[in-house]
Amino acid sequence: MSDLNTLTLAQARDALRKGETTSVALTEACLAAIEGAGALNAFVHKTPELALERAKAADERLQGREEAPKMCGLPIGIKDLFCTKGVPSQAASRILEGFKPEYESTVSQQLADAGAVMLGKLNMDEFAMGSSNETSCYGNAVNPWRRGNDDAALTPGGSSGGSAAAVAADLCLAATGTDTGGSIRQPAAFVGITGIKPTYGRCSRWGIVAFASSLDQAGPMTKDVRDAAIMLEAMCGHDPKDSTSAELAVPDFEAMLTGDIRGKVIGIPREYRMDGMPEEIEALWQQGTEMLRAAGAEIRDISLPHTKYALPTYYVIAPAEASSNLARYDGVRYGHRAKLAQGDGITEMYEKTRAEGFGHEVQRRVMVGTYVLSAGFYDAYYNRARKVRSLIKKDFEDVFAAGVDAILTPATPSAAFGLGEMTDADPVQMYLNDVFTVTVNLAGLPGVSVPAGLDKQGLPLGLQLIGRPWEEGDLLNTAYALEQAAGFVAKPSKWW
């Protein structure tokens, strides 16, 4: 078989079962692709020896008598936000320089237990704060796609930009991501792959470096919807180490992919029609609506009245939680510690370490969070944002109670933009990238981004489906129907 790294998880799994290839061969193909893709800066820590060791173990397991798990022998990348035992886990921040955890995150452990092969750690925005992968201490990851005849480097999105770039460029068969306000779905849309953020509590957060604890959720980033179903099943499950982890059975998501959505009710929220939205995004949304109607779904106009408050609500709650979570990084026990001048005490050590260790965007969000939690502003900002969050959640509950099965929206307000294009812009311009995705996190719902077309410059555009809580199987089936109808098969032309 040629170009093993271009296979989907499902194709590779079937090839392994039939004896047409081996996990070692798959892993070597991916490692070779990674070595040749330095220009993308997707992988920031490579683990070739560990990968080949796991691949050999997977091959032995596949030849054993017992049925091996679906993910057995499949090479994947792990976002740098996941703690991986003995492997650098920095959350793309200088403050965690040299940190090698003594433990493994629950999600990466479950994938390892299922036989998945970790190729290394993937680039991301620092502490998952960003929408362009430009806040990383490793430098930005680069989108494998290019505009028409233009050689300008584009963002792969963020914060899971390295994961997105690696999957789109066939450096790995799939990757883990995390999503706090759109960090799986926005990059997936920017590079033409599938990304699902499951219901809050479906995947354990234990061992994932925290950004905003009430919003963070891990999920898979894959080449298609079937792969997302396969990988999500391996990532899910109750974890007693995470108090927010749901004690629910994990269904066989792949078995639910029938593509039959006849009789399903799809909601189209009028509040997502924004001023200044590019015509191409509007047209794609309309096409997606017609595709689902043609597949037998009933299309219903719906209202989510508090949508306009979602972005400001998110950018109060997320920084507030981040300022609390990031207080633990002080240079005392691990990570970066600033060099001190004579006479400097503990306070100076904290101040200098944090000033050197945190990048500008992280510092901005910590300051915003500290401000909204301060005595004079707690009620005016933080408490008010929490109340609005509950109203946003109720909007969705009302719509689902009225019989809607899933909601179709654009995934992003534009295609991928150029690296550096927003450097001098108002930070709010960057935050607007999350305008269609943050509501899903605030309400704790599952959301999936599916590639559905190209813009006039040849860049991928995605559509988002939002589902009922805990019904990822149903949501993925609707996404599968959309994927089949859209027929998106475009790949980036190799320039790296």
UniProtKB/Swiss-Prot annotation:
The active site is at residues 79, 159, 183. It comes from the Bacteria. Its EC number is 6.3.5.7. The keyword Lipid biosynthesis does not apply. It is an enzyme of class 6 (ligase). GO terms for biological process: translation. It catalyses: L-glutamyl-tRNA(Gln) + L-glutamine + ATP + H2O = L-glutaminyl-tRNA(Gln) + L-glutamate + ADP + phosphate + H(+). Keywords: ATP-binding, Ligase, Nucleotide-binding, Protein biosynthesis. GO terms for molecular function: ATP binding; glutaminyl-tRNA synthase (glutamine-hydrolyzing) activity. One of its GO terms (cellular component) is glutamyl-tRNA(Gln) amidotransferase complex. Allows the formation of correctly charged Gln-tRNA(Gln) through the transamidation of misacylated Glu-tRNA(Gln) in organisms which lack glutaminyl-tRNA synthetase. The reaction takes place in the presence of glutamine and ATP through an activated gamma-phospho-Glu-tRNA(Gln). Heterotrimer of A, B and C subunits. Belongs to the amidase family. GatA subfamily. This is Glutamyl-tRNA(Gln) amidotransferase subunit A.
